[in-house]
Amino acid sequence: MRILYYDCFCGISGDMNLAALVDLGVPKKYLIDELLKLNLGSEYEIKIEKGQKLGITGTRVDVILKDEHHNKHELEEVLHNHEHKHNHHEIKNDEPAHSHEHHHRSLRDIEEIINSSTLNDKVKKLSLNIFMKVAEAEAKVHGRELYEVHFHEVGAVDSIVDIVGAAICIDYLKVDKILASRVQVGGGFVRCAHGIMPVPAPATVEILKNIPINTGIVQFETTTPTGAAILAANVKEFTQKLDFIIKKTAYGIGHRDLEIPNVLRVYLGEEESFQDIENQYILETNIDDMNPEIYGYVEEKLFKVGALDVFKTPICMKKGRPGIKLSVLTNEKSEREVLDVIFEETTSIGVRRYKVEKIMLKREFSKVKTEFGDITVKKAYYKGELVKYKPEYEECKDIAREKNVSIHKVYKAVYKQDLK
């Protein structure tokens, strides 16, 4: 399994992300040619070159706006020096115009630009997902409807390039899973249209809800709303554990000189593909006062609401009473309904809950032709080789009844086939 890991020890911004992914292996020409499909090429140029921060070499990306003769990162210098007079993504209002004349595009404008392009559907969808993260945050912060939001910085062409460029690069890398570390957001304060605001800015905080962060490593905004949205729209899990083999490292160089390297580090890794690991939960309870006939009914209901496995263990409880430990394996999605069944249908008044990692072999299902008809077979692979398989019991049972034959004959008919 191919892994992309973001090490955000100094945060993340749109340009640093683009630079890091180019440094990781996305060809410059491919990125530039794909971005031209947005039909915004007359508004900007991209400068991609090697750079260094505190001795670390990586790639630096500048999006140069043709109609302004300066780039986005000069604007960020103003913002980060607390002289900027607008929010990162401001609601359009009656305040004086931006000192740098950006196009203040709405979400609908951006959707039209992306949807009318010739980019592939996956890139379009991913780009829109990232923009939606920003739009939802801005709408929440400013108390507006989603499509009333007008962007300043993120609606400018340089930020559109950062976001759509991120989608292009992720699509090119063909990774199976994206992970990230805790996100460093920085500290201090920034002057915005509404006054002096703490770092991270309100929109950034909204985007980073439910995402683990670190603060205060420098008195500077290290994670921008664009960078936060790229993570929020793509990362499957935020973890400090690197449970994969690192194949390549790359660095996106930032534009500030800090006491720590102003870089975004990314890893391209390989996770052993013969197995998959899922985080699941065990819910269990000890019961010694329930009619044993009811267990079968309870088990049926548990499976119906999404339990992955149900098992019962004989136990000896206090005062020598025999009992049953009812254990249910479930995922987070079905946990609430599983608990409802346990509390409503058993005599339990308390449940133990703990998280487990389930390690699974890679599996697939296929049809096997037999003398009794087609039967579904589950195959399991280890290190790329088929190591075990078995027919689906319910199908074998139905065929045995329909054909009036022993179920053992149905199983044998499957195992006679050469499935390797």
Curated annotation (Swiss-Prot):
> What is an annotated GO biological process for this record, any one?
protein maturation
Q: Where is this region: Disordered?
A: 81-104
Put simply, this protein is called Pyridinium-3,5-bisthiocarboxylic acid mononucleotide nickel insertion protein
GO molecular function (one): nickel cation binding
Keyword terms of this UniProt record = Lyase, Nickel
- PANTHER family assigned to the protein according to its UniProt record, in alphabetical order: NICKEL INSERTION PROTEIN-RELATED, PYRIDINIUM-3,5-BISTHIOCARBOXYLIC ACID MONONUCLEOTIDE NICKEL INSERTION PROTEIN
Q: Give the catalysed reaction(s), semicolon-separated.
A: Ni(II)-pyridinium-3,5-bisthiocarboxylate mononucleotide = pyridinium-3,5-bisthiocarboxylate mononucleotide + Ni(2+)
Q: What is its EC number?
A: 4.99.1.12
Recorded source organism is: Clostridium acetobutylicum (strain ATCC 824 / DSM 792 / JCM 1419 / IAM 19013 / LMG 5710 / NBRC 13948 / NRRL B-527 / VKM B-1787 / 2291 / W)
Question: Any coiled-coil ranges, and where?
Answer: none
Lyase: present as a keyword of the record? yes
Reported function: Involved in the biosynthesis of a nickel-pincer cofactor ((SCS)Ni(II) pincer complex). Binds Ni(2+), and functions in nickel delivery to pyridinium-3,5-bisthiocarboxylic acid mononucleotide (P2TMN), to form the mature cofactor. Is thus probably required for the activation of nickel-pincer cofactor-dependent enzymes.
**InterPro entries, per database record:** Ni_insertion
Entry's NCBIfam families?
nickel pincer cofactor biosynthesis protein LarC (TIGR00299)
